[in-house]
Amino acid sequence: MANRGPVPSPLTPRQLECLSRIASGETSAEIGEALGLSKRTVDHYVLNACARLGVRNRTQAVAKAIGDGMILAPPP
């Protein structure tokens, strides 16, 4: 079978942005403020990302997104 390049992310750009910011240590409220969204909207993006990734919580979602190369790990 021919290599067709990288597999597209199952997540939306906004979900990826939220997970990236969570990985950097931001809370849902901080992410919402920075992006002009409510905390509840951010939580909704994260919940949907968890469902798409097949994980149970935001920590697992961040770990899977980093492990699968969807987002970059934050600097130490």
Briefly describe each language-model feature range:
Residues 52-76:
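Basic, Lys/Arg-enriched C-terminal extension of HTH/homeodomain DNA-binding domains
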Residues 26, 39, 50, 69-70:
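Residue-level detector of secondary-structure transition/capping positions
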